[in-house]
């Protein structure tokens, strides 16, 4: 039996000691009086259990005999009729050779077969009585008693004799000590406990090996019990069962297994099968293992296979759990020259995405660990060890241990003598050792789908259009908020915002302007958060902006580009155009696309082409005349064609402009914002430096009309304007008389918000924002400039929210900044300052008595209106309350007014209606006549 990790607390220590002593006393009485019930006809069981001369020197039908003066092994062999080979077979682990055993001197120990000596020892006297003088028998032992005397030793006599002995001993101690009654009681109980322990040991030694680990703290968490029971045992084969139970990490786990061990002259091979059951977490696992042992060496391999699937975790919130599949390989070795010193090596590996190999708070994918350790056994009873484990994630454990290895089949003297450590390391000494395996179930975890979100459809729409976003949100604890990252969309003037309902999952997308030649595809991400702070995965929404000529929700061209900007005007060099056709963001195959030359002289390879499996249709263009060409593409469902950027066919024998580009197509008409034009001049396929380029425009102001190319053949100019309008810039070189035109650009007036043109929705009055607010009252801002297509956002929607038309709803007292972005990517802001007061209707459905209304206002750090004039002022600034969506269902919003001293004495008050302006006096305060309308 191995007992390790045993500790006790100081609390209830006295009660625990008494409990164990009383239990021991009862067991002692049971075994002392009923010891003969264990007799089975074998001589061993007939020995007196209270004869310490025998009990301390016998084990498993063997006598551990100490040679006396003048005795030798040869004499014992002759006098007892035991052959020397039989004696040598029992003493191989004590002596290096048979000759060394024969030389054993007085004081040394020899193991003899107990059954051969049963006649001499079955009638030994009880310790404490007068011994019979030995004659011609083993020295130090008694002679046979007479037959009559033997017959008188019945079980009742033995019990009475033992009781008399212990009573005499107790009386002697009481005579020699002046102690209280507790000492007498404890001494008596201790004697009975010792007897129980002795009898229990004699009984348990026939039932295998037990390992106990008790932790008295933390409700015995960490405690375990394992028991190996041989049920068929021969010299060459052992069949056994093993049971175990443990309470670790607040989980109760049981293990049930069976196996066989086959013993060869120098080694052992074995196998075992286990079922592990976690009763707390309802997890089941199968274990299959193999063993190979030799003297001073043990090895084992174990495989672990789950038998239960995913289910809610027993002690890890918001997770599911199941056993992890895995294996381990273990090696234990000891030095034959110094068997007290041993080493350990183990590798373990488990499989799963979130396996808790180390603890439930540290989860790893397919983790593994290597354990190395050393141990020291100074005497068979005690083993001390230190293990170091290193595993996945750079996890490290350093474990110290001390084990107490109590063997029921060995006398106490053998368990505290260093010379007997060697036997533990042999096959015969470890025959009944427990299976080396991991009895704890290693678990694999999976985060529950407590919060998930998805968008079933991406968005495709024309520039500046508004689209409702369909969100599907599943939340275990309720949705708190959704956070969007629409930065890429905002840079072009679009945004994601709440729709008018302002529910947690009610959003809409406002698309930016279409960028000619750009990708016009935006990736927007969002993440949901629940009321417990959990977050969902990032979900991506793809928004595709189409030009006004394209058709949403129909088969249309989303992109039309050329593979190069110029080609030789030799009627051979070609430019390839690719049109991409999609419907709702999905590529469409087998769709006819028609192509047409909008301007210039050139030849298309085909007037139409069908899209391939990727939704792409291609056509080539060639020309034998220098000049600029524009090509368009269209599907049958499109209302207008989509133009590609202009391309240029050049005469390579002359210096020619091969491309003209702009850095942007829109700018602010403030004489500061500029658009940069870049042209490239080449001749014979090489860039030309020092070439003069002449620029012209039909609108705006160029910073210069001539520019010279650099070493790479580039020349640049800039265009600005102080007035809104569209402009086309052209360029030409002296060797080619034809102008090359750039894409059309547009200048927009500077964007601004006039703070003196704030319109109150309920009255239609335009001016500055009133300093006293009606909660959920609305005003409309007016933006001017830009391209006239605006998107709005608020810095703090809890204070003030804004819709896509610039209508602001005042939600709470405070300040916020409203930003408007135009389609040409200009922005302007308007700051809402904290008002002097805000009128809040705490409850617009249920009328209440004056005192209740006053309490409701105080609960939100506000008060009832001090006078009717306060409410009249609100009405004059905001109009009837029911002109706003929040109050639209209210035909009346009668508000209590703060009582005067005389009103309070009379139990009355005044009211004012924010819908009808009806004013009443001397209204009975105890009746539910008005609403709780508060001033904050």
UniProtKB/Swiss-Prot annotation:
Matches recorded under PROSITE patterns: BIG1, LYSM
GO CC annotation terms, alphabetical: cell outer membrane
GO terms (BP aspect): cell adhesion
Localization annotation: Cell outer membrane
Domain Big-1: 557-650, 657-748
Disulphide connectivity of cysteines: 857-934
Pfam families documented for this protein: Big_1 (PF02369), Big_2 (PF02368), IAT_beta (PF11924), Intimin_C (PF07979), LysM (PF01476)
Predominant localisation class: membrane
Boundaries of every BIG2 domain copy: 780-831
Chain's role: An inverse autotransporter.
Family named by the database record: Belongs to the intimin/invasin family.
Name of the protein this chain belongs to: Intimin
Highest classification ranks of the organism: Bacteria, Pseudomonadati, Pseudomonadota, Gammaproteobacteria, Enterobacterales
